């Protein structure tokens, strides 16, 4: 069985769409659950980091009971690290959301059975692009085959 945890390298969204098209419905559901769990963890992490940032910037003096100890032990030198972490987490969240959308599109496509999945349509559109050029070489002058006549 395949899982998001088994991926050894970052995978681009197009590769992800291709990979999920060959998976079972159960695998799609499992991967979606794993991604949604990761999204929840990142959102909680960003909320906590947001509190740290607000505390360091002096914008938030309100402390919740469970956060007061953690917020008292933060160092002002950590501000840049916290901001970078939030920014990186947002990028990962966007990537995860793209994957959830792709999983939902694949599921809808499988349930409706109508037409082609969005990924298949996009892939076909990319292969059909290009200039319409006459590739027929039957009119080539044998004496000067590499010449261009204007």
Curated annotation (Swiss-Prot):
One of its GO terms (cellular component) is cytoplasm. One of its GO terms (molecular function) is protein-macromolecule adaptor activity. Induction: Expression is increased in absence of RPN14 and upon treatment with tunicamycin, an agent which causes accumulation of misfolded proteins in the endoplasmic reticulum. It is found in: Cytoplasm; Nucleus. InterPro entries: TMA17. The modification Phosphoserine is found at residues 24, 68. Keywords: Chaperone, Cytoplasm, Nucleus, Phosphoprotein. Disruption phenotype: Decreases cell fitness. Causes severe growth defects and an overload of polyubiquitinated conjugates when associated with a RPT6 thermosensitive proteasome mutant. Residues 110-139 are annotated as: Disordered. Residues 118-127 have a biased composition (Basic and acidic residues). Its main location: cytoplasm. One of its GO terms (biological process) is proteasome regulatory particle assembly. Interacts with RPT6. Interacts with the 40S and 60S ribosomal subunits. ATPase-dedicated chaperone that assists the formation of the RPT6-RPT3 ATPase pair, an early step in proteasome assembly. Plays a key role in maintaining homeostatic proteasome levels and adjusting proteasome assembly when demands increase, such as during proteasome stresses. Function overlaps with RPN14. Present with 2110 molecules/cell in log phase SD medium. PANTHER family: TRANSLATION MACHINERY-ASSOCIATED PROTEIN 17. This is Translation machinery-associated protein 17. The lineage of its organism: Eukaryota, Fungi, Dikarya, Ascomycota, Saccharomycotina.
